[in-house]
Structure formats: structure tokens, C-alpha cells
Swiss-Prot record:
L-glutamine binds at residues 364, 392-395, 415, 476. CTPSs have evolved a hybrid strategy for distinguishing between UTP and CTP. The overlapping regions of the product feedback inhibitory and substrate sites recognize a common feature in both compounds, the triphosphate moiety. To differentiate isosteric substrate and product pyrimidine rings, an additional pocket far from the expected kinase/ligase catalytic site, specifically recognizes the cytosine and ribose portions of the product inhibitor. It comes from the Bacteria. It holds the Pfam family GATase. This is CTP synthase. Catalyzes the ATP-dependent amination of UTP to CTP with either L-glutamine or ammonia as the source of nitrogen. Regulates intracellular CTP levels through interactions with the four ribonucleotide triphosphates. Pathway: Pyrimidine metabolism; CTP biosynthesis via de novo pathway; CTP from UDP: step 2/2. UTP binds at residues 18, 197-202, 233. The keyword Transferase does not apply. Allosterically activated by GTP, when glutamine is the substrate; GTP has no effect on the reaction when ammonia is the substrate. The allosteric effector GTP functions by stabilizing the protein conformation that binds the tetrahedral intermediate(s) formed during glutamine hydrolysis. Inhibited by the product CTP, via allosteric rather than competitive inhibition. Keywords: ATP-binding, Glutamine amidotransferase, Ligase, Magnesium, Metal-binding, Nucleotide-binding, Pyrimidine biosynthesis.
Length: 568
């Protein structure tokens, strides 16, 4: 009888400072192990008390990444999906809010049989249960070889302690030979002395050891290469094998990180330590990606007109989907961050958008900056600039075309104006109690993957290459069906709807009116992969490239025109 395969656990922690790139490090390691033929899944443990990031300010948290099954998760889950090239579920993100809610609910039901409910063992047991779920077979019945779990926050944070203790207990439960602790730390460079300093990393590792965790390997983040003697010093002072000290200086692209970690031998070291099957990394797919990243044959400039552009992480999946769309055409996408407020006037929109090859209107919430988004759409529509609207972007496209083409000057959304003379965008039927405050706001939007039917021959159908698609959603408002006929007569094409025809999913202008003017109620950026660009983004970038090429074409001026010009 064959011996049951043991699932390996890799825990990724961070020290010294936040925003070191733990998520990208973990994702890159996952990509390397996947390229070695291993089945990898990933999880993020977030120490904040929010149940999920769905109600958090984008300026504080960045984007909310929505999974296929409708979970609102941390943006690192997006990194995991893009690097692993696989869909994850709601189990991939665990927060303190979820853990405490579950434990308190059990206590109220009497499941603890009168025990005093404590952080240890009740909270830690709940965290361990969430970690164990990741080791179970997926919907296809396949069990992972490796579960990579990233612990959010920084070692030393009070709120991280229960999660770190749970990880320590998992090592005890499954055996030390089946666990690997990877610690990401900062090695700062002090310009006055001209030195890289190891003391912060030593203190960070000491803090980990104080709670019973000895890291097996260290990823040392720095703005420059680490000398070998410095790596040997870190290995000695932190009690880590020399092969386990990995230098990870800043890379030109996030997609270079797997190559950097591989060149330092991290994946080979981990495979040996965990006794995993040793196969060479297959670079065929990722190598082709890096070739497209670093050797573009063309460039294209896209304006991203948003409300949260001061924090680019608020649009992380959008920017990566745009870049991936460029990779599909061996083009480098240069993103111009345009605050939507600057486009409220015609002159402001012209100043911000002239010279752009494409305009993207991303999602968002609230009335601030909406007139600027409408101004940007108006400029792009009237100047024939390829335009893509996502979620709120579609709604703004509908409002703008209703005002400009259908003669509904007071057209608006009930999100921004209530009551509204022409509510071309209205609250979804099952969302009225949320808007009125009678139901919780968190986790109640239309979330997750939903199917759509596309009109054959439409721009979106040709982009997808099919007429039945499914995309992820996150919204409370929709196109008001009572205005669909009037908008259609004005020239707006409803090129995709829900299978029952009730919900508008895609709109566009005909090709004879505009080269590419497409909006979707969905968030297609969430399904884009660097190695498999989303077809809608690939089509948008292609339209931008064609627009750029047309702008550069020489213009023939007839002799009569030249003569009349000369005589003026």
C-alpha cells in the first residue's frame, strides 16, 4: 500500500519594516516551486480586526481583490493568483476579525462546554484550522504538495502574536521536517558610513526566537547587492545555514524576483530541506514572460483616470492587467496617473489626456471626482481615443453618453444624486436595504464570478473570441433597464448582459463611431495573468497601439492646399 504523501508547510514572516515585499517573495517562491512540477497553494494571515478589507479606505489598504467565490481579500491574494496562475478561494485570506467572530459565535452556541475562552488554545486552534483547510483537496480532488502561508504585519506587532504562535504549533503538529520558516528582513544602507547594517535583521530574528520560531532561511531585502562576507555574518549571528541567507536587492520588475531568488538558490535549498522531489525549474513560460518584459518592440501610453491615484496599490490589479496586455503585443505600457478631479473642465481634460494613446476609467465609490471621470470620457469619446471602463467606469460611460448622445442632460446615478431626474444608473434590487442602513454594508455587494452573454460580432465578443464569458464583480449599482431603449437609439450598444438579459454587463460604441469605446460592469483585471493576459486588456492595448500608429502616419497635403497656405 503506497505511503500517504506528507504536505509541506512554508511560513513567510517579515521583520524590521513593513512593505518589504513579503507577498511578492512568497509568490515568487510559489512560482519557482510550481515550475519544478509541484502543486502549490497559498494563504495570507492578516492581523487586522476587520473581517475583510471590503469596507476599508483604499488609501489605507490598497485594492480589494475579489476571488471567484466572492471573497473580498487582501491585494496579496492577487499576487498569489498571478504568480501561481491559478484561482484561489476565500480560504486564502484569514483575518483576526474572521477568527474572533468564529470563536465568539462558537462560545455563544455553547460549543466550548463552559471552558474559559482564551487566545491559547481557542484563538490559535481556530487559526490552525484555517491553515489546515488549505491542505485539503481542491474542487478537482487534487491535494497540494506545498502550502505557503504569509503572516501579515511585522514580527513584534502585538496583533501578529496569535498567528505566529499558531504557526509554531503547526510545526509541532506536522513535524519539523515538514515545515520551513522563511523570514524576510531589511538590511538598510547607511550613506554616511557607506555600510549595509545587519543589526536590525539580527534583532528581528531574535524576536522570532523569543516566541519559539527559528527561521530556516532569510531573504535580505536591500537597495543593492550584499557582499558574501556580510551574508556569512548574518548566517553566523542568526544561526542560519549559509545557503539559507538569500540576497534580494531591488529588481527592475516584480517578475524578475523568481529569477533573483533562484540565482541565490532559495528554491533548491527549500526543496532539499523539505525532502521534496528535485526537478529542474522549467523556465519556458516565465522566461518568455521576462523576454517580453525587458525587450518590448513598442511603447504605448495609457492614462489611468482615478480617484485614488495617490496610492497606486489601490489599482494594483488594473496596472498589472494593463502591463500584461502590453506583454501580449511585446509593448511596454507606460501608465500616466491622472487624478479624476483634473478632468472636470474641457481644458483640464485636454491638458491631462492629449498625447495619450488610451484612457482607462477604473472602479471606485462615491461622488468625489465623478464629474472629472465624465470629463475624461467625454474627451476620449470625442477625440477617438481608445477607452476602457471598469465597473464604475462603465457606469460613468453610460452617464456621459446619456447626457451627450441621448439628450438626458440631468442623467446621473442614484449613488451620486437621490432623487435623480434621469437615474440611468440605479441601485440593484437586493441592495436597497444596505443603502438605507437596514443591512450590513460589509460583504453584501454583488461579489464573485457571474456569467454573461455577448452579442455576436460586437467589439467585446471579438476581443474574447467567444460569446459566453464569466467575470468577477463587486458592485451595488447597475444600468437602469428603463433607459436601455432610449440609450440604444442614441447609439450606445449593450453588447453583453446576464444570461437572463436583466443585467447589463458590457456596453460599447459601434466601430464606425469609435475605434474602441468599451465598458464592463465586471472587474476583468482580477483574472488577468502576466503569462495569460486578459483578452479585454489585450484588445484595449492593441487598439491603443493602432491609435498611436495612426497618429504617427505622415499626412499628405495636396498642392492646392500648400499653395493656399503659402499665400496666406
Amino acid at each position: 500500500m503506497p505511503q500517504a504523501r506528507t504536505i509541506k508547510h512554508v511560513f513567510v514572516t517579515g521583520g524590521v519594516a513593513s512593505s518589504l515585499g513579503k507577498g511578492l517573495t512568497a509568490s515568487s517562491l510559489g512560482e519557482l516551486l510550481t515550475s519544478r512540477g509541484l502543486r502549490v497553494t497559498m494563504q495570507k494571515l492578516d492581523p487586522y480586526l476587520n473581517v475583510d478589507p471590503g469596507t476599508m479606505n483604499p488609501f489605507q489598504h490598497g485594492e480589494v481583490f475579489v476571488t471567484e467565490d466572492g471573497a473580498e481579500t487582501d491585494l496579496d491574494i492577487g499576487h498569489y493568483e498571478r504568480f501561481l496562475d491559478r484561482d484561489l478561494t476565500r480560504n486564502a485570506n484569514v483575518t483576526t476579525g474572521q477568527v474572533y467572530s468564529a470563536v465568539i459565535a462558537k462560545e455563544r452556541r455553547g460549543e466550548y462546554l463552559g471552558d474559559t475562552v482564551q487566545v491559547i488554545p481557542h484563538i490559535t486552534d481556530q487559526i490552525k484550522a484555517r491553515i489546515r483547510v488549505m491542505a485539503e483537496p481542491d474542487e478537482d480532488g487534487r491535494t497540494p504538495d506545498v502550502v505557503i502561508t504569509e503572516v501579515g504585519g511585522t514580527v513584534g506587532d502585538i496583533e501578529s502574536l496569535p498567528f505566529l504562535e499558531a504557526c509554531r504549533q503547526v510545526r509541532h503538529d506536522v513535524g519539523r521536517d515538514n515545515c520551513f520558516f522563511l523570514h524576510v528582513s531589511l538590511v538598510p544602507y547607511l550613506a554616511p558610513s557607506g555600510e549595509l547594517k545587519t543589526k536590525p535583521t539580527q534583532h528581528s530574528v531574535a524576536a522570532l526566537r523569543n516566541i519559539g520560531i527559528q527561521p530556516d532561511a532569510l531573504v535580505c531585502r536591500a537597495d543593492r547587492e550584499l557582499p558574501e562576507d556580510l551574508k556569512r555574518k548574518i548566517a553566523l549571528m542568526c544561526d542560519v545555514d549559509s545557503d539559507g541567507v538569500v540576497a534580494c536587492p531591488d529588481a527592475p520588475s516584480i517578475y524578475d524576483i523568481p529569477r533573483v531568488l533562484h540565482s541565490e538558490g532559495l528554491d533548491a535549498y527549500l526543496v532539499r530541506r523539505l525532502g521534496l522531489p528535485f526537478r529542474d525549474v522549467d523556465w519556458s513560460v516565465w522566461g518568455d514572460l521576462l523576454d517580453r518584459v525587458h525587450k518590448p518592440s513598442e511603447r504605448v501610453r495609457i492614462a489611468l483616470v482615478g480617484k485614488y491615484v495617490d496610492l497606486p496599490d489601490a489599482y494594483l490589479s488594473v496596472t498589472e492587467a494593463l502591463r500584461a496586455g502590453g506583454f501580449a503585443h511585446r509593448a511596454k505600457v507606460e501608465i500616466a496617473w491622472v487624478p479624476s478631479d483634473t478632468c472636470e473642465t474641457e481644458s483640464g481634460a485636454a491638458h491631462a489626456l492629449s498625447g495619450m494613446d488610451g484612457v482607462l476609467i477604473p472602479g471606485g465609490f462615491g461622488v468625489r471626482g465623478i464629474e472629472g471621470k465624465l470629463g475624461a470620457i467625454r474627451y476620449a469619446r470625442t477625440h477617438g481615443i481608445p477607452t476602457l471602463g471598469l465597473c464604475l467606469g462603465l457606469q460613468c460611460m453610460v452617464i456621459e453618453t446619456a447626457r451627450a448622445l441621448a439628450g438626458l442632460e440631468r442623467a446621473n446615478s442614484t449613488e451620486f444624486e437621490e432623487p435623480c431626474q434621469h437615474p440611468v444608473i440605479s441601485t440593484m434590487a437586493d441592495q436597497h436595504d444596505v443603502i438605507s442602513g437596514d443591512r450590513d454594508m460589509g460583504g453584501t455587494m454583488r461579489l464573485g464570478s457571474y456569467p454573461a452573454k455577448l452579442v455576436p460580432g460586437s467589439v467585446v465578443a471579438e476581443a474574447y473570441g467567444e460569446t459566453e464569458v464569466a467575470e468577477r464583480h463587486r458592485h451595488r449599482y447597475e444600468v437602469n433597464n428603463s433607459y436601455r431603449d432610449r440609450l440604444s437609439k442614441a447609439g450606445l450598444v449593450f453588447s453583453g448582459t446576464s444570461p437572463d438579459g436583466r443585467l447589463v454587463e458590457f456596453v460599447e460604441l459601434p466601430r464606425d463611431q469609435h475605434p474602441f469605446f468599451v465598458g464592463t460592469q465586471a472587474h476583468p483585471e482580477l483574472k488577468s495573468r502576466p503569462t495569460r493576459p486578459h483578452p479585454l486588456f489585450a484588445a484595449f492595448v492593441n487598439a491603443a497601439l493602432e491609435y498611436r500608429a495612426a497618429e504617427r502616419l505622415p499626412v499628405d497635403i495636396s498642392d492646392s492646399v500648400q499653395e493656399s497656405t503659402a499665400s496666406v
